[in-house]
Each structure stands twice: as C-alpha cells, then as structure tokens.
A protein has these predicted regions:
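Fe-S-dependent hydro-lyases/dehydratases of central metabolism
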Residues: 1-173
Length: 173
C-alpha cells in the first residue's frame, strides 16, 4: 500500500532459506484490481478483503499472481484501510500485491518523517493485465467468513437471516 512489494513465505520456504537454499518462483502474471466507488461508513477493510477473496480464491484466478490495486476507489480509502485490505490478500492465494500511490500515500510518508521515500506509482496509460477483478466499493456490505477458509465469505445480513443454510454450506465443505 506504500509502493512496495513483499512476498510471504510459508514454513517450507523458510526452512529452505535457513538451509541456504533457494526456491524458484515463476514469473508471475499481474491481475488488475479495479476499485471504483467508496466504502460505506459501516464497511471496513475486512469486508472489502473478504469480498475479494470470496470472488477469486476457489477459481484460482489470482493464484501465484501479483494483484495491482488501481482505480478511483483507491483514493477513497485511508492508508490504514488499504493496509487492512492488503494484509488479507495472501488469503486469496496471490503471490503479492501492490497499490497505486497517491496524495494520501505521500502524506503518510511525510507524517512518518520519510518524505524522500515516496515514489509515484501508477499504471501506465496502456497498462495491460493478465486479468481484471472489478470491485465497486459502493456495493460492499458487512461480510462474515465461515469455516474453514476466508473464501467462505458471505454478507452478514444473509447469514443472520438464514443461518442454517450457511452452516449447511460450510458442513458440505
């Protein structure tokens, strides 16, 4: 969310690194996550993250790919909100994620006494992606993740209205 890219490591990757061995990562594809709209006041970063994970995990659409968050919706969210979404992106099975930077990002670096670390990052005019995920932030509602993975994400109101239906879905998994 601050113009950087990191890759999470699991136990096997960490063990290889401790033994001085490398692990291969294929050149990843890049999926554009086009954010439009603005989250409602009662919607938090976890709701947005669960909506994304619910859309892409089970079909492996973003598996081992880089998510690039772009679009006018990015600027509608604070840095803390973006960070909240970003911490959950690994649950989508993506390799990593990167966000377009903006004035809020610049202010974040200034507040943290690192103004020289800010770099403008945005997609080029003719940017091409291996796929696109469109997220209209205006339509996101409070979500809940049921066992056994965050991709079992449903609107909270739906689960409250018919808990038996959603518990049955979870049991089938």
């Amino acid at each position: 969310t601050q113009g950087s890219v990191s890759i999470g490591e699991g136990g096997p990757e960490l063990a290889k690194a401790m033994l001085g061995k490398y692990y291969e990562i294929e050149y990843p594809g890049v999926i554009g996550v086009l954010l439009t709209g603005k989250p409602k006041p009662w919607v938090g970063p976890m709701d947005v993250a669960l909506s994304i994970i619910g859309k892409v995990f089970k079909n492996n659409f973003v598996k081992n790919k880089i998510l690039e968050f772009v679009g006018p919706g990015v600027s509608s969210m604070s840095m803390d909100f973006r960070n909240g979404i970003d911490t959950m992106t690994t649950e989508s099975a993506c390799l990593s994620s990167v966000w377009a930077t903006d004035e809020q990002t610049k202010r974040y670096f200034e507040i943290h006494k690192r103004p020289d670390d800010f770099k403008e990052m945005k997609p080029g005019h003719a940017a091409m992606y291996d796929g696109i995920v469109e997220i209209n932030l205006d339509t996101i509602v409070p979500m809940i993740a049921l066992p056994f993975h965050p991709s079992n994400a449903y609107p909270l109101a739906d689960v409250i209205a018919d808990p038996e239906k959603y518990m049955t879905l979870t049991e089938k998994e």
